[in-house]
Amino acid sequence: MIDYTKNSVRFDGLQTLEEKIAVLRPPPWPRDLFGLDDSLAALGKPLFEAHCSGCHAVQASVDVPGAWRTPVLAVGTDPKMALNSARMSDAGLLTGALMPPPAIGARIGNPAKAGDMLANTVVGTLLAEAVVPPVPPPAKLAQSGVFRALRKDFANLPGENLDALLDPKLSATAKAEAMIKIRAFINAKLSNLFRPPPAIAGAAYESRVLNGIWATAPYLHNGSVPNLWELLKPTKDRRTSFMVGSRVFDPKNVGYDTDQSPFKNGRFVADPANANGNGNGGHEYGTALTDEQRWAIIEYLKTL
């Protein structure tokens, strides 16, 4: 039996970070510092809409669930991260641990899928924090990270309100009933962690919204492409080696200076064959455009 209450997770700090992240906005392009060619950006907008917006929509689609989910076989980028949850590993102390819903009753074997072990630990720790008695005093409960996180979710459910738990006159029975609801809610919310990990045919990456994309180099999920200019090239023409760690920004190519590094071993070597997790292949969209059209798209991306 694993005692999930014995953990070093700082829930209050984690929830504070989540609340800060929730109000972050993408940074605007520093026009005063680097300038912006508005005419070129205007030429880039229709090119972006024709060649990029199918995956990188500016707003989420309410009509097509999972519209930003791009299959690995379609985008052609390194599949290792997408398939990582299916990796088998020594389960160690988790061997024999019960699985939460929807796999309730099943136990973790040895070896086990890395995704199953991670999900089991996350769910067990959250449940232990949220529902293990005794319920703390109202003032302390209101400030707890788990309560603050759940409070927002419960507010969107008809007839549900966690604030009742803050009533010092609430009976022990009523508190227990509320905690049972919380446990069921967490189980339901986290059950999708236990979906079977995908084979290559079902693996996918999120094709993110590109607001503030200028500030997020290097590119692709593994940072294997140094700047936007390189990303719009065919794989065969991309740099396979560049320096990382520089804080000198390159406003022309939109990335960081890749010819210098503050680190002794600051050279990144990409794998065009996408075999070792550092692949820079794939995402060959817009690679048939002219250089002038690529520069126009890049100028438009600065405006997002």
Residue ranges of each PLM-predicted region?
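Periplasmic c-type cytochrome electron-transfer domains
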Residues: 1-304
